[in-house]
């Protein structure tokens, strides 16, 4: 959003993509973040282990499946500290690397009534370069992508990404889809691990820790050298959830994918001229 040109550019060495995601989280994340989103596990007594060849293949395929499902409905929840939580509900198109949705900030506001706990809300758009915020048009109850089309480029407050949990989550989210699978052998060699088998909304998913950060020593540090990124992948390589542990925060940033959103058409206005 911080730029108006093409946002797609492919990284020459795709094998480094997973390590780039880890860098976004600033590594060295707080202890206990993963435990906050363990959920229901079918294998509570089974120890974690390195991924098998089949599991690495599914994990490697998950990014392509996400790309092919575009546009996809997403929900991002980020804890900013001090009891403040930001929730973004939107749609991501991995073919254009653009996304649009609504955001809501909650916390202790001191207010009463229907708006108790709500600190802010509005529309949000983001791409690989940054994000933009705008107020919801008065009296417009359409979907966020429809509302955003009627707000000119000049109506958006745009900025580049920072290192706060929301921005890190948006950056992670916009980069998850890809037009080809990753290298499963590289994922396995880089320390991806099977953690458990969980159920989400009645469906089974394998929970994986992503590859280790570059230079991390297995078993070292409070997190055992494990990646701050955790993925929930089904038997067909479909990605359902990703969590990202952040430094100093006990609750990880969470991204939920709920499938193809066939009704959505991402607007051109936020990325258009200055009208």
Model-predicted segments: where are they?
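Beta-turn initiation residues at beta-strand->coil junctions
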Residues: 76-79, 102-106, 134-137, 243-248
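Solvent-exposed loop/turn segments connecting transmembrane beta-strands
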Residues: 80-85, 109-112, 248-251
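An acidic-aromatic
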Residues: 96-175
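Structured extracytoplasmic
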Residues: 35-39, 45-51, 129, 143, ...
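Gly/Pro-enriched, hydrophobic low-complexity segments
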Residues: 197-273
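Solvent-exposed helix/loop surface patches that form functional interfaces
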Residues: 149-203, 271
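N-terminal leader/targeting segments and the immediate start of mature chains
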Residues: 2-91, 95-97, 264, 270-275
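Short, surface-exposed charged micro-motifs
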Residues: 89-91, 121-124, 228-232
């Amino acid at each position: 959003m911080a730029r108006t040109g093409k946002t797609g550019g492919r990284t020459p060495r795709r094998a480094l993509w997973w390590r780039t995601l880890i860098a976004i989280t600033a590594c060295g994340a707080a202890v206990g973040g993963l435990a906050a989103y363990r959920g229901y596990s079918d294998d509570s007594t089974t120890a974690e282990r390195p991924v098998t060849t089949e599991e690495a293949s599914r994990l490697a395929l998950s990014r392509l499946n996400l790309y092919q499902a575009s546009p996809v409905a997403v929900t991002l929840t980020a804890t900013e500290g001090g009891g403040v939580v930001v929730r973004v509900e939107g749609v991501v198109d991995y073919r254009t690397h653009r996304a649009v949705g609504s955001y809501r900030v909650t916390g202790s506001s001191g207010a009463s009534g229907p708006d108790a706990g709500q600190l802010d809300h509005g529309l949000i758009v983001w791409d690989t370069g940054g994000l933009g915020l705008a107020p919801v048009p008065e009296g417009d109850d359409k979907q966020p992508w429809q509302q955003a089309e009627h707000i000119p480029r000049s109506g958006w407050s745009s900025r580049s990404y920072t290192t706060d949990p929301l921005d890190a989550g948006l950056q992670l989210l916009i980069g998850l889809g890809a037009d080809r699978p990753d290298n499963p052998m590289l994922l396995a060699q880089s320390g991806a691990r099977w953690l458990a088998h969980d159920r989400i909304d009645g469906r089974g998913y394998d929970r994986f820790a992503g590859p280790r950060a570059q230079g991390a020593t297995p078993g070292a540090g409070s997190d055992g050298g494990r990646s701050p990124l955790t993925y929930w992948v089904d038997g067909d390589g479909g990605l359902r959830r990703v969590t990202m542990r952040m430094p100093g925060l006990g609750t990880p940033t969470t991204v939920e994918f709920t499938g193809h959103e066939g009704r959505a058409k991402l607007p051109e206005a936020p990325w258009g001229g200055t009208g």
